[in-house]
Regions:
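Active-site-proximal, substrate-binding regions of enzyme catalytic domains
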Residues: 2-84, 91, 100-103
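Short glycine-/small-residue-rich flexible loop motifs, especially phosphate/cofactor-binding loops
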Residues: 75, 94, 111
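Short alpha-helix plus adjacent loop in nuclease-associated cores
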Residues: 108-115
Length: 115
């Protein structure tokens, strides 16, 4: 599994509600989200979650017409990070990630990996 993960908002919220957010830190060396995801999440983040702005907004802008802003920013950041894993559950976002060659996992898959 990759050492870096980029997370979408819904996955952060789910793991937080289950009190399992710590799993990300146990499985990955770097956990990154975008400022858009931080805003959607709306909670204080732990220090080990890095907020990283997307540098090249081209993919994010293109994706926003089909998927949520947070998901679009997560995919764009995953493109920039390279060799990372993206955690997302939305089907449209998963299809976009697949088309762009990005490896992803869902929240359920992440829980299975943590087991």
């Amino acid at each position: 599994m990759s050492k870096i993960i980029v997370s979408d908002t819904s996955c952060l919220i789910l793991l937080d509600k289950l009190n399992l957010l710590f799993i990300l830190k146990e499985l990955f060396e770097e956990i990154a989200i975008t400022p858009e995801i931080e805003k959607e999440y709306g909670q204080t983040l732990t220090a080990w979650i890095k907020v990283v702005a997307v540098q090249n907004k081209v993919y994010q802008t293109m994706l926003q017409s089909a998927i949520d802003l947070g998901e679009a920013s997560a995919i764009a950041l995953a493109i920039e990070k390279q060799n990372c894993l993206l955690i997302l559950d939305d089907n449209k976002a998963r299809k976009a990630a697949t088309r762009l060659g990005i490896n992803y996992i869902g929240a359920l898959g992440l829980l299975v990996e943590a087991k």
